[in-house]
Amino acid sequence: MKINLRDITQANWLDMIDLEITKEQEKFVALNSEAIAASKFYPYYINKGIYLDDMPVGFIQYYPNYDDGKPNEIFIDQLMIDTKHQGKGYGTKAISLVLDEIKQLKGINAISICYVEGHDVMRAFFERFGFSVVEQDEFDETIMELHYA
């Protein structure tokens, strides 16, 4: 069994909508339907399904950080693993694949994420990959960054 990433297309977007998070997690992550809908208005958003072989288990969205005037930075906006598949290492493998994919992009030298204050699990998760806290934004979210050459 192998984790892989797939582009979100007309053929698989409903699979992403069917993925679920716990009620508690709803305060930390947007619904996949909202993230996919937003990407239709921002063509530079990249949506990926996280699959275990051919079974959808999660979703990730990232994009060049044009909104903050940082075109050389990729912002990972959404990462979720379905409740039935959490705690199995799929998120760790998926983020490793995404980081490798992003590092291949020309002109990109940083990756950032944000998490809602109090979501210590997310902070610890990204610290394992070398991200460090850089600021607290006006929305009470903590910004973490990873810089590379």
Regions found by a protein language model. Name each.
Residues K2, D7-D77, D82-K84, I95-L97, ...:
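Acetyl-CoA-dependent GNAT
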Residues L52-D53, L146-Y148:
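Active-site beta-strand termini and strand-to-loop segments that position acidic
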Residues D82-K84, K88, E117-G118:
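Active-site acidic-Proline motif in GNAT/NAT acetyltransferases
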Residues T92:
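Residues forming the Rossmann-fold NAD(P)(H) cofactor-binding site
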Residues Q104-C114:
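Conserved GNAT acetyl-CoA-binding A-motif
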Residues S112-R123:
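Conserved beta-strand-loop-alpha-helix junction that forms the acyl-donor binding cleft
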Residues C114-Y115, E127-E145:
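Conserved catalytic-core motifs of GNAT/GCN5-like acyltransferases
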